[in-house]
């Protein structure tokens, strides 16, 4: 069921510098337990655990990740009982961790808090409100002076204003930004009644006879017809619609969606339209209309990302991943993240990468834990984040689809994985240069290769900083395929490899070596003994299940 015996929680998903952190525990463990606060592998302080709630004041440094853990000593050995990460960042765009919402029926405050507490425990700092709006061309139901209390969404579900605003308020209490979702260019069949002009649409022919549209059959209330973001009239119209939204709802920004490449398109006058080229103009217009609000735009399969969205005023880059090759799928993920880094001059990447996709489209079932964790290990090790958590975990592009459930083991693992990417954000997502690692196992327990992954081997990813190297080991020992999506849910759990004698090339005199893994010790780091011989060190990796991070610190 995913119940965690000793669960640590914090009152927020992220903190402003100088803000105190409130920590709490569901159960008080027996015996002498110590609370330990760390930044990376450096212990900042330790205090005895005396109760189920307390507060901590981190340093006022901005953009820092911390790990807090509870440990006890048994027979001279340290045993970690629980941990939680803390992100101190004045702006979530520095380390975005996206979640979503997809249902807005009548909900009590208690029900809303249950969903948001779960996102909060995963340190989600941006929440995108999928399918919340009334109509694509008129997102607000009613008017700013008389907003509707209940409206029908695109599939005729009831949406409650009290639920949408309740979620926004709950997010703000937890340090999360709320982004409302909408297409850049969508209009429903009744748009003329709401002031959308015929000349604003995109057409499949030069004589404005056939509008381009996204077909949606019953129970959806309308197809979605495409408008032309190149037109200032449409941009002004949408900016006004969004102003109406902001007057009623305390949203923090707009998550802009698109539908990928649409083939040949023409405007009303028969001129050819390069759809991707319209995105920067649209984003810029939305930013000018509301300079204080955050913007993000989905690049479907990277459509419109390079030189266009990537250079626009968006908080971070967001890619919906559709390429899923069976034999080198994981390099699709790393290529997207490294391209985005380069194209945007270092903005972070969030991937909408839907797991166990075929399984999710077939009906009720469970996510395949190894598939999900292998995808997350790869995305996180390359410095990305994975949009996957909401009221349920995502399996398809229709966000309300909750056909697949998470097993208890996956629920538990997700908590630690999110602690890991938050606690070690300064290594995973904060500078450094990727490099090719030279590493091998001297005891024959593993075969090591540089990224990309090879079945039955361990893949390494290196990141070099001024005075440290970070080396990720990702385990593909039993992989039956290398498709990140694990579409049919057939991926096999890797073998646990313990105390592996490892040889790694280094660039200078080594001061300390430490390791951390989301699969062991609740992600808490441990220092390791090592021997240096010239430009090599020998070190025993304590364990490798899915992903272990080795950190080499230099003098």
Task: List each model region and its residues.
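An acidic-aromatic substrate-binding cleft motif
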Residues: 81-135
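Active-site-adjacent "subsite" loops/lids of carbohydrate-active enzymes
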Residues: 90-96, 102-109, 180-249
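The substrate-binding groove and active-site-proximal loops of carbohydrate-active enzymes
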Residues: 95-109, 145-161, 219-236, 265-278, ...
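Aromatic-lined carbohydrate-binding/catalytic grooves of carbohydrate-active enzymes
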Residues: 115-116, 120-162, 186-201, 205, ...
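Active-site neighborhood of glycoside hydrolase catalytic domains
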Residues: 230-316, 322-334
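Aromatic/acidic polysaccharide-binding cleft in carbohydrate-active enzymes
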Residues: 347-432, 477
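Carbohydrate-binding surface patches
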Residues: 445-507, 548
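C-terminal beta-strand-rich structural cap/linker in extracellular carbohydrate-active enzymes
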Residues: 533-555
């Amino acid at each position: 069921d995913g119940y965690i015996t000793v669960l640590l929680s914090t009152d927020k998903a992220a903190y402003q510098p100088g803000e105190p952190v409130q920590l709490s525990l569901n159960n008080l463990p027996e015996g002498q337990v110590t609370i330990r606060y760390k930044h990376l592998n450096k212990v900042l302080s330790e205090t005895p655990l005396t109760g189920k709630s307390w507060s901590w004041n981190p340093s006022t440094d901005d953009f820092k990740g911390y790990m807090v853990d509870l440990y006890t000593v048994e027979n001279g050995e340290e045993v970690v009982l629980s941990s939680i990460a803390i992100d101190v960042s004045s702006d979530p765009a520095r380390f975005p961790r996206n979640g979503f919402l997809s249902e807005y029926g009548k909900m009590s405050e208690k029900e809303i808090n249950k969903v948001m507490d779960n996102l909060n425990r995963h340190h989600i700092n941006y929440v995108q409100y999928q399918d919340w709006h009334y109509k694509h061309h008129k997102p607000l139901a009613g008017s700013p002076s008389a907003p509707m209390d209940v409206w029908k969404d695109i599939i005729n579900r009831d949406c409650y204003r009290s639920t949408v605003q309740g979620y926004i308020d709950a997010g703000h209490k937890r340090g999360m930004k709320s982004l409302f979702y909408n297409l850049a260019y969508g209009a429903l069949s009744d748009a003329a009644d709401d002031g959308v002009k015929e000349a604003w649409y995109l057409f499949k022919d030069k004589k404005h006879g056939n509008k381009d549209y996204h077909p949606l059959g019953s129970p959806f209330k309308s197809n979605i017809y495409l408008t032309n973001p190149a037109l200032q009239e449409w941009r002004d119209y949408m900016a006004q619609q969004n102003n109406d939204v902001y007057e009623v709802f305390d949203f923090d920004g707009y998550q802009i969606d698109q539908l990928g490449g649409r083939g040949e398109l023409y405007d009303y006058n028969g001129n050819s339209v390069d759809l991707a080229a319209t995105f920067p103009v649209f984003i810029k217009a939305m930013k000018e209309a509301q300079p204080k609000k955050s913007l993000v735009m989905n690049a479907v399969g990277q459509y419109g990302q390079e030189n266009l969205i990537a250079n626009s005023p968006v908080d971070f880059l967001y890619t919906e991943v559709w390429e899923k090759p069976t034999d080198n799928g994981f390099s699709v993920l790393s290529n997207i993240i490294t391209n985005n880094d380069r194209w945007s001059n270092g903005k972070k990447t969030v991937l909408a990468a839907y797991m166990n996709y075929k399984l999710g489209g077939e009906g009720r079932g469970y996510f395949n834990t190894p598939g999900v964790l292998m995808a997350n290990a790869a995305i996180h090790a390359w410095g990305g984040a994975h949009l996957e958590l909401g009221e349920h975990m995502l399996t398809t592009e229709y966000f309300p689809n909750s056909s697949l459930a998470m097993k208890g083991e996956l629920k538990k693992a997700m908590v630690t994985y999110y602690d890991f990417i938050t606690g070690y954000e300064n290594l995973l997502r904060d500078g450094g240069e990727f490099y090719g690692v030279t590493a091998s196992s001297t005891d024959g327990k593993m075969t090591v290769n540089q990224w990309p992954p090879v079945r039955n081997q361990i893949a390494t990813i290196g990141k070099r900083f001024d005075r440290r190297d970070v080396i990720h080991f990702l385990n593909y020992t039993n992989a039956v395929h290398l498709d990140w999506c694990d579409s049919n849910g057939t991926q096999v759990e890797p073998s646990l490899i313990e105390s592996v004698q490892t040889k790694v090339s280094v660039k200078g005199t080594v001061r300390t070596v430490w390791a951390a893994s989301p699969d062991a010790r609740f992600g808490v780091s441990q220092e390791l003994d090592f021997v240096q011989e010239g430009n090599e060190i020998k070190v025993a990796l304590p364990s490798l299940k899915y992903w272990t991070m080795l950190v080499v610190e230099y003098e």
